[in-house]
Amino acid sequence: MTLMEDAKKGIVTPSIEAVAKAEGIDAETVRSCVAKGLIAIPKNNRRETLPIGIGKYMSTKINANVGTSRDCIDIDAEVEKAKAAEAFGAHAVMDLSTGGDLNEIRTRILKAVNIPVGTVPIYQAAASQKVVVEMTSDDMFNAVRKHAEQGVDFVTVHAGVNLNSLERLRQSDRIMNVVSRGGSFTLAWMLHNGEDNPFYAEFDYLLEIAKEYDMTLSLGDGMRPGCIADASDRPKFMEFITLGELVKRSRAANVQTFVEGPGHVPLNEIELSVRGMKELCDGAPLYLLGPLVTDIAPGFDHITGAIGGAVAGMYGTDFLCMVTPSEHLALPSLEDIKEGLFVTKLAAHTIDLIKEGPRERAWRQDTAMAYARRDLDWEKQFELAIDGDRARKIRDARKTESDACSMCGELCAVKIVKEAFGEKKAEE
């Protein structure tokens, strides 16, 4: 049985218990939400890994993308990135490799980390042929099965890219058309072969494979906007409608899902996108890359993504895909992964401060930091900081003889008031 089947039968599995304990909430609440598809716990039945809960009442989770490209094939480097991502606090990693021995890369990453691993099987299907459009539907489904057999916990499938959404795209005035790599492969295949997307047309077969391995489906946003000018258009919302229908079919088949969300969205349209997705997809967990809130920040897109992610979290985002400084520019380095992760962790924490479920725990962290700052307890501040090593290096780089920081020294407001209150109490 799948985890969702067990949950529907009232069974609190070890994975559900582990998630409930980690989140500090009642196991029955987690079970009920898994049964309804409001929480996903991506965990292939062929792989032992740390159960991670994504969705309602859960703390906001973070994914880190790693993987080779055809221009940069260094398997050892990508494995190290995956291990570093876990060490820096990622809750999942996705292997997006397109160059080299894809099976070897995936196998090594699966062995290297103890967190859920996701993939995009169509990348392997495309690599099986000289030209993307020459892959067959068998290539596509064989890739999904191969990944499932190897223990992949969740796969992105762009099943919402179909003939209907293609027609909406043709009628639109989009600047960037399609920027999803998997979405572009699917679109090109449909146009070349004159057929509908196999992942959509044969979705029931996809569900059979996913169910056999209890592999979660991440329903990809192949029509996500690639620039601010394309945000909130018909192709995007047409895909949301389709994905919502596929969520219902997945739940009926006892297959867990979460839904991927929009790429570039201005601040004032994020609420529309996120609430729209939640409504159209019946409360399924939402997995967002960003959204990026401006197009003019190459080199700083980890920041534009974190801004968008934090705002999106106000309206229901559950799972943030880390963006690195290399977005739109190059394959990310190990340092890019670290930088992107810490910025995304910051966004996730700001979401948790207001999210039902993790709110109390997040508030305790901030309150503890407030007391440490009041007491000028630097070691405690470094311990509580999202990146304590960085905080320590900055403080140590500009020394002061004061127990305050070098910005204010003896003129520190906290220090002055603390001493003033101390003198007043001594007089009393």
Curated annotation (Swiss-Prot):
Its cofactor is [4Fe-4S] cluster. Signal peptide: none annotated. Disulfide bonds: none annotated. GO terms for molecular function: 4 iron, 4 sulfur cluster binding; carbon-carbon lyase activity; zinc ion binding. InterPro entries: ThiC, ThiC/Bza_core_dom, ThiC/BzaA/B. Pathway: Cofactor biosynthesis; thiamine diphosphate biosynthesis. Zn(2+) binds at residues 264, 328. It catalyses: 5-amino-1-(5-phospho-beta-D-ribosyl)imidazole + S-adenosyl-L-methionine = 4-amino-2-methyl-5-(phosphooxymethyl)pyrimidine + CO + 5'-deoxyadenosine + formate + L-methionine + 3 H(+). [4Fe-4S] cluster binds at residues 405, 408, 412. Binds 1 [4Fe-4S] cluster per subunit. The cluster is coordinated with 3 cysteines and an exchangeable S-adenosyl-L-methionine. Substrate binds at residues 65, 94, 123, 158, 180-182, 221-224, 260, 287. Keywords: 4Fe-4S, Iron, Iron-sulfur, Lyase, Metal-binding, S-adenosyl-L-methionine, Thiamine biosynthesis, Zinc. One of its GO terms (biological process) is thiamine biosynthetic process. NCBIfam families: PRK13352.1, thiC. Catalyzes the synthesis of the hydroxymethylpyrimidine phosphate (HMP-P) moiety of thiamine from aminoimidazole ribotide (AIR) in a radical S-adenosyl-L-methionine (SAM)-dependent reaction. Belongs to the ThiC family. This is Phosphomethylpyrimidine synthase 1. It comes from Methanosarcina acetivorans (strain ATCC 35395 / DSM 2834 / JCM 12185 / C2A). The gene is thiC1.
